[in-house]
Amino acid sequence: MDRPTRRSFLVSAVAGPAAASRISAAPTQARYRILGKTGLKVSEVGFGTEAVSDISLYQRGLDFGINFFDTARDYERGSSERMLGKALAARRKDVVFCSRSYAKDARQFSADLDLSLKETGTDYFDIFYIGAKDNPKDVPDDMLEAQAAAQKAGKIRLKGLSTHRIRAMEPLLARQHFDVVLVPYNFTKGKFDYTPSVDEQAIEKCHKDGLGVVAMKVMAGGARFNRERNLPLKGFFDKNPGAHLSALKWVLRSPFIHTTVPRMTSVEMLEENVRAMSERYGAEDEKILIAHLERIRPYVCRMCGACDGACPRGLPVSDLVRYVTYADGYGDFPMGYRRFQALPAEVRAVRCMDCRSCAVRCPNGVRVRDRLIRAQELFA
């Protein structure tokens, strides 16, 4: 998908005045794509609302032309839906409003939907996801029926699925129940990583099948938001100027991604993300991200699934690494803690320090044992 660029980038060194100028340039207005067969016109960069405490940021996003807003009831310690509903009330028909349920059964899904509608003060969601499902067995038929019934009743316009494992969910997607899929997609899945970008093939298929494709986890760990000195991801974006902008441009280079939902907690982040919509991904960005990938490699899960079932003590390895990233990368300890505490008691009781060595080996270079111990230290 061709998009006009505001200026050309010279192939140059990563650091120095050129890199600094990339960060300081003024933002422009939003650009738009069509969300699959839904026909909805959505801004290429949407608004991920985790950890947003300043309601004026939403108004600023609207001023830039952002019209896609993604939330969940557990974001920002339970206040995100209420705050976003208030912010969007006057522009409700102009925006795409999304939320989700992490329910395990149909009854809870329906209850979650009704409560989210009440919290936001809206009559309907444009998209309501069955959230965080990575195995088709975790989505029973009666939950699909409940989602379809909600659509028929006008409580939701489009049926969504949120997953961290799009390949694993392909059999469910093949049933053609869903209208929109929310998936991780970032530069760690690019040609310069160790594993083949098979997720890109699955995403392309979703696009060709008419599904709306929304990308999450677009910053590959969110390290830009970390400000605490004692955390391992501190300062990675600071050490690699322009990495945040380049990471989002990498995602937007794909014609199979219709919109994205990066979290934004400041005007600076918002303006930089808006810039990404008007600048092409180029050779300079490639250099920046190659360097950045090597810095984050030991810490950030690619969600490739290679470690599934590898722990002899039954730990959900990739989930635990992701929960640590919520705390250490995003600076969102409460989210990581809630996810960890939702695990079965026998999983929460495991201590990796008890093992002499770790049976899990990551093909992408994540230091699995260190990350799991970190999760247990933080959340157990």
Regions found by a protein language model. Give the residues of each.
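N-terminal secretory signal peptides and thylakoid transit peptides that target proteins
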Residues: 1-17
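C-terminal segment of N-terminal export signals and the immediately downstream linker at the start
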Residues: 20-45
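Conserved, mostly hydrophobic/aromatic
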Residues: 35, 47, 69, 84, ...
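Active-site mouth loops of central-metabolism enzymes
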Residues: 45-53, 99-107, 233-239
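Distinct, well-ordered alpha-helical segments
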Residues: 58, 81-89, 109-118, 137-146, ...
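Glycine-rich, proline-tolerant flexible connector loops at the mouths of alpha/beta enzymes
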Residues: 68-87
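Active-site groove signature of glycoside hydrolases
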Residues: 120-135
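Beta/alpha (TIM)-barrel catalytic core signal, keyed to glycine-rich beta->alpha loops juxtaposed to Asp/Glu
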Residues: 131-315, 319-322, 329-335, 341-344, ...
